[in-house]
Each structure stands twice: as structure tokens, then as C-alpha cells.
């Protein structure tokens, strides 16, 4: 099953695509162009996640509780009340300015028998940077993992579109 969604959120378009979807899992990809150099895009991605991630897609309700740790075994983690935390994804590959690969299940997928691999690829392009986001998720649910493909695809497309707006204008796009 292939589906293509063109998502328009404030500033620009993101091509969001469900590459594969079936009972055992799904793969989604979002591609967009950002009008900034790859080094700047990468730096803002790594260090400013609290400025552009939608707080509605956090457990704490505050995107400033998110952080990306850029060392072996690092993570995309979130601080929770009372010294709590959640480790959304583990960083398994870091090629500064070029590529990040994470392993794990984000958000509500953590409570399911699911895991995934998420890649962020930063490529120099005419006028800036092409950002490809690919998330492959596998697992078991009685009614199939494919029911999660569309919501995950839409959530990721929203986040990277907000990121694009943040890099280009200094403010994340709102819905």
C-alpha cells in the first residue's frame, strides 16, 4: 500500500508518504526543502528541539523538556515531573551535519509490542538543505500495526514542517 499526503502547515509543503503498511508494521517518509545551509539546519535540529516540536506530542506537555543527546548511547529523551523521564528513541548513528539514526518506539508506540528505526538525512541542495525523515516500525498488534501508519505519518510531517518554519523564520508553524 502506498499513499501520498501533501501536508501544508503554515510555511511550505512536506511530502509525507506511507511507503509500506501491513499487519506487521509500516514505513513512512517525509521530505522537505529548507532554505538554510545543512550545518545550520543540523545544529538547530540537535539543539533547539524545544523550540519547534509540538508540545501536544510530548508526555509532559512541554517541548522544552525534550533533548537530543549527541553521544554514543544518546537519546531523544523527555524530562517528566518528579525526576521522571522517557527515552523516546536511542541514538545509534551520528554523522554530524549529515545523518542521524535512532532506534525505538515514539510516544504511544512505546506501550505496544513495537520498535522502529528513524532516520534524519540532511543533504545539501540548491538553495539550502533537503531533509528526509524515514521511520520504519515493526511489531505485533492483534488488529495489525498498519492502523498506526497514518497517524504516525501525519505527526512526523507536522514536526518537520514546524522545524522548517523555525529554521526559516525563527518561529515554528502552527496548525
Feature annotation, model-predicted:
Residues 14-63:
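Hydrophobic ligand-binding cavity/cleft-lining segments
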Residues 41-42, 76, 91, 102, ...:
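Hydrophobic pocket/interface hotspot
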Residues 48-88:
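Short beta-edge strand/loop motif at the mouth of beta-sheet-based domains
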Residues 98-105:
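Short, solvent-exposed secondary-structure boundary/capping segments
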Residues 165-175:
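Short, highly charged C-terminal tails/helix-capping segments
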